[in-house]
Amino acid sequence: MTTTRHVALAVAVTGASAPQWRVELRAGAHQLVADEPATSGGGDAGPAPFGLVMSGLAACTAMTLRMYAERKGWTLASIDVDVRYNVTDDGAASIDRTISLPVDLPAERRDRLADVAERTPVTLALRRGVPITTTIRP
């Protein structure tokens, strides 16, 4: 028997009185704002939706690598993750992720962390694709 467990919840709210594309978000106990940049007609009050998705991937990558390194007893002065969502003229999409680790990190540890990065929860969800069920309520 398959068991489904709730992993994350996010709620987005906007209304006629909200500035152009601004949306108030709630993720657990945290409140955020999403918006479009001024160049797209928004007020640039927060990240655009794809920025939020890419931020989630970057955060999950950095957190997972840090957890792994700490469990192994490895000291990492920093982990920087740069994620870019790209779309070609014909609509093909790709994500480029660049992870910067300390220069003095031994090659075998660097290789192991590269392998771990390929299996973070958000990486796997994006790669596998996730079925989305939409319900419209009054």
List the model feature ranges, each with a label.
Residues M1-M54, M63-P138:
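Extended beta-strand/beta-hairpin segments
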